[in-house]
A protein has these predicted regions:
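Conserved helicase ATPase core of P-loop NTP-dependent helicases/translocases
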Residues: 64-66, 71-73, 183, 194-225
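Extended, charged helical/alpha-beta scaffold domains that provide interaction surfaces
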Residues: 357-599, 603
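Conserved segment of the helicase C-terminal RecA-like domain
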Residues: 122-136, 216-217, 221, 234-297
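C-terminal helicase lobe
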Residues: 157-174, 258-261, 266-349
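Conserved strand-helix element at the start of the C-terminal RecA-like helicase core
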Residues: 35-50, 126-129, 135, 166-191, ...
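Post-DEXD/H (motif II) to motif III coupling segment of the RecA-like Helicase ATP-binding lobe
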Residues: 37, 102-157
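Inter-Walker segment of RecA-like/P-loop motor cores
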Residues: 54-93
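Interdomain hinge/linker at the junction between the two RecA-like core domains of SF2 helicases
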Residues: 4, 8, 68-78, 132-170
Length: 632
């Protein structure tokens, strides 16, 4: 990929612009027109998505997928879809492309993107994709790079404040903490029937399942962190911000206009316009920020991150010094504190490891082990212990099967809360990464399958848990039916349970309908379908009541009159103690039937009190006179 002999006619081009401008489509099309090619994506999710598209176009045998956790490399693969970190550096390709190069300014991963800008070249064509904010710095690095600016295909407009409960369907709400995402999702479930969840902590499989829940129309709302700002092309009309402050690893800070635009740009696709706004008055964006977002005019990047990739493995000190080498441009910031460097520093201080670093090969092995990611982002002693044990085992051969089994199997559980499942997924993803290092294991394919199976199992369980917690399942099923058939079929069973499209939505208790669904627009539509069949049943029940035998009625000590064990009326104060009145339950479904029911009430009701003043008699009424049965 970094060939020494690049054709002098090889072109370098940058395609820059906001989201929804067809940049990735262009790069994929260009790659597949070459005899070989590779694209580096910022997310595993994106690499997988475009891998699947390429497979459809040119066949599975011609396309490879390479990420930290997944490697599918057919023997004669021509086209590679990779995460930027996992691009095979030793290979040469006719076409090379790097997506989202403005991430060179990201404090955590930026140095990787900067390295690819500096060094990744196709022998015939190189295409960089990203935001226009990186243009000035890119042209300083590559003066001969041809730059094309792509305009957004639709408009993005600010519509101000709109409360969460008033958001229209096909809206996304963005927050920047897991508890806040959960709080909003629960509110939307109550008021709107449910929402899908997208967070960076989700595994790709869980995220895809949640996105499908939204895309298929089963729910109309999406609650997300800024994880939706990249790589998720969805049918979103409006993006609402519940906050504009995020924790960037060091401290809370306000989002920049460009960052807001990256997220808001998910609204509207292709030529369909989108909108963005906030959910509270105090969040209103500044006029200048709004103008920048609507016109896609942002301040250019001033700095990007860099770290030396020409490392010296002659000794530990030489390796550390080479990592600390100064950048080639004054607008590049030297990256310090990367996870691999922190792990190297920690492990090399351990005597059990330091004393074993006796060659370039050993030091190189240690450095490769330090690349093992900590997906939990906790950098705990558990992660250091994992790296240390891995190093010790690889020094004497391959990773021990029994040890691998014990490490992987501990995560093969689906009990616990949502956060527990998220933690297990983070841990098993680390093992998915390790098992993809084939030269570290004797039975790599087997262990890859084991780790992937557990990750998939946990991911599916997490999706189910999120759906159970944040989605009214009845709404989901009925919403899908509504989209397919428009008309909903409702029935009442003999036990009073009311079903719409075979989903129980409530029960008819006497003359009262008790719904089980949450409030909201979809619930209202579904309950309307249910209520259409209720008036006839109410009239039937009134007719049955009027001809019922005495045994069908009961009079309780609380004054309630029950018919067939359902409360239908209550005694209320009348003209005197011996002349109470009957008040029929206030049911929205009785209508004219209620008038008929009231006529059976008479003024000459007699209540017999005995002993301690408790009512010992049942009042059973029928026809024109009350009927009293003494219980003695």
């Amino acid at each position: 990929m970094f060939p020494k002999n690049i054709d002098k006619n090889s072109s370098i081009k940058a395609l820059l612009g906001p989201t929804n401008t067809g940049k990735t489509y262009y790069a994929m099309d260009r790659m597949l027109s070459h005899k070989s090619g590779i694209i580096g994506f910022p997310l595993r999710l994106l690499a997988r998505e475009n891998y699947e598209k390429a497979v459809i176009q040119v066949g599975k045998e011609n396309v490879a997928l390479v990420t930290g956790e997944e490697k599918i490399i057919p023997p004669f693969a021509k086209y590679f879809c990779c995460t930027v970190e996992s691009m095979p550096l030793e290979r040469s390709f006719s076409f090379v492309s790097i997506d989202e190069i403005q991430l060179a300014a990201d404090p955590e991963r930026g140095f990787i993107f900067t390295d690819r800008i500096l060094n990744a070249r196709g022998t015939e064509e190189t295409v960089f994709l990203g935001a226009e904010t990186i243009r000035p710095l890119l042209q300083k690095i590559l003066p001969n790079c041809e730059v094309e600016i792509r305009p957004r295909l639709s408009t993005l407009s600010y519509i101000g404040v709109k409360k969460i409960t008033r958001l229209k369907p096909r809206s996304a709400v963005v927050a920047f903490s897991v508890p806040e995402v959960y709080r909003i999702a629960e509110l939307v479930r109550t008021k709107k029937g449910g929402a899908a969840i997208v967070m960076g902590a989700l595994s790709p499989r869980t995220r895809n399942s949640q996105v499908e829940l939204y895309q298929s129309g089963q729910v109309d709302y999406l609650i997300a962190t800024d994880a939706i700002g990249m790589g998720l092309n969805m049918d979103i009309d409006h993006v609402a911000f519940a906050s504009d402050i995020k924790f960037d690893g060091n401290a809370p800070r306000h989002l920049s206009a460009a960052e807001i635009a990256q997220i808001a740009g998910r609204a509207g696709r292709h030529s369909r316009n989108g909108s963005f706004g906030v959910v509270e008055d105090y969040l209103n964006f500044e006029e200048d920020t709004i103008e920048q977002i609507e016109t896609h005019s942002f301040m250019s990047l001033r700095n990007i991150w860099w770290r030396n990739t020409e490392l010296n493995f002659n000794s530990l000190n030489n390796l550390v010094r080479s990592l600390e080498a100064p950048p080639p441009f004054n607008f590049m910031r030297k990256k310090v504190g990367a996870l691999d460097a922190i792990c190297l520093n920690h492990l090399s201080e351990q005597d059990s490891i330091k004393n074993k670093i006796d060659s370039k090969e050993t030091l190189s092995l240690l450095w490769n082990i330090c690349q093992i990611p900590d997906f939990s982002n906790s950098l705990s002693s558990m992660h250091f212990n994992l790296l240390e044990k891995t190093f010790e085992l690889l020094l004497i051969g391959k990773l021990d099967n029994d040890w691998i089994s014990s490490q992987i199997s501990r995560h093969d559980r689906v009990d616990g809360e949502i956060d527990t499942l998220l933690n297990r997924i983070s841990n098993i993803r680390t093992w998915t990464f390790i098992t993809n290092r084939k030269n570290w294991l004797d039975e790599a394919d087997y262990w890859q399958a084991q780790a992937k199976a557990i990750e998939d199992k946990l991911s599916d369980e997490l999706h189910d848990r999120l759906t159970q917690r944040f989605v009214d399942k009845k709404i989901v099923i009925l919403n899908k039916t509504m989209k397919e058939h428009h008309n909903l079929e409702a029935v009442i069973r003999l036990d009073g349970k009311v079903f719409v499209e075979e989903e129980e939505v409530g029960t008819l208790n006497g003359f009262d309908f008790i719904p089980y669904l949450s409030e909201g627009e979809k619930a209202a539509t579904i309950l309307t379908a249910a209520r259409k069949i209720l008036p006839k049943e109410i009239e039937r029940r009134v007719r049955e009541l009027l001809i019922s035998d005495n045994a069908a009625f009961k009079f309780n000590s609380d004054g309630a009159i029950r018919w067939q064990n359902n409360k239908v009326a209550i005694l209320v104060q009348g003209d005197n103690l011996y002349s109470p009145k009957i008040s029929v339950n206030n049911s929205e479904l009785l209508f004219r039937a209620a008038v008929k029911l009231k006529k059976i009430g008479r003024k000459d009701i007699i209540i017999i009190m005995v002993g301690d003043g408790q009512i010992k008699d049942q009042l059973i009424f029928k026809s024109k006179k009350p009927w009293i049965k003494r219980h003695t």
